[in-house]
């Protein structure tokens, strides 16, 4: 089974690097429910956040703010999320690069 190198961001915790199986079920297990990809405007590359689609409705704990390009917060994520690449020329998710792990570990620290 193919695995993806990702960052998992849990409420109140520092982001951590993890290998996650490239299956819908594995991603749903990490976020605790149905997944939804989110593409924050502050991200200048092909990275997306995989969040729990119903996190706010289910009352999951607040996690991190999502920001506009100027740094202004415009939304907040509820519950654990993971960060993956979502290349425009593909329908599949991909592993983060070492550079992206550094950038997003710092961004969501």
Role assignments for model-derived ranges:
Residues 1-109:
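Domain-length accessory/inserted modules outside core catalytic folds
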């Amino acid at each position: 089974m193919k695995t993806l190198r990702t960052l998992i961001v849990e409420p109140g915790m520092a982001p951590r690097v993890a290998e996650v199986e490239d299956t819908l079920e594995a991603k749903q297990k990490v976020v605790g429910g149905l997944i939804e990809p989110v593409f924050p405007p502050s991200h200048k590359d092909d990275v997306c956040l995989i969040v729990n689609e119903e996190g706010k409705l289910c009352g999951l704990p607040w996690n991190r703010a999502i920001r506009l390009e100027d740094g202004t917060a415009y939304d907040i994520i509820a519950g654990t999320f993971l960060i993956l690449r979502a290349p425009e020329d593909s329908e599949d998710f991909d592993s983060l690069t070492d550079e992206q792990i550094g950038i997003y570990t710092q961004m969501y620290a």
